[in-house]
Amino acid sequence: MKNTLNVKMLYQFYHHAVKAELKKNGFSADIAKKINAEHRKIIERAKEIGKSKLLSSYIMTSYFIAMNRSTGKSAEENYILFRDGLCASKLFHKVIGDVEQYLDPKKMPGRLQWSADSHKRKYENDWVVDILPGTETYDLGYDYHVCGACKLCQDEGCPELAAYICRMDYVLAEIMHMKLVRTGTIAEGAPYCDFRYSRLSDAEHRKES
């Protein structure tokens, strides 16, 4: 895929957070350089997904693959480094926003259009999604029938790493003060990924604080 300005910005966004965590944990500066070099190679090989709404998730995946080829640590250890780096980043918290911004009803028309466009399957590695309006049990749902993270990991010969990107979804939901319920993912062998997002109850808010 082309190393566009958006791709570079997303890479730097993740790299800045992870570099701080690597330094905190005593890694040499050479590790960050190795990640950078490896990530460039992955991007050169990666299939295009156009102006996908989930480009950030695609680059999160490419970055995580690069980490696993550079740090000498296990996938679990790299996941923890990545997770903790993002959680410690004030910029990351600011960029992803909060529950009210995420669940703003004004965003629904755009989401429905995204869903319709995704089913055209213009790009092999892009996500294909159905958007589910809220019900009595959740506020917003997604059913993903194709996962770009799984596709990229498969292309790179490391399908086992996709499950760690799935785990990051819970981290993002927690940062936004939302509850995510999911019964299966494509990475785990399910036919689709069923995301159900909800606002936290008063009791859950108290527990979180």
Positions of the model-derived regions?
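Short alpha-helical "patches" and their helix-cap loops
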Residues: 30-34, 75-88, 182-187
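Conserved helix-adjacent loop modules within structured domains
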Residues: 130, 155-170
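A generic structural signal for short
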Residues: 7, 157-158, 208
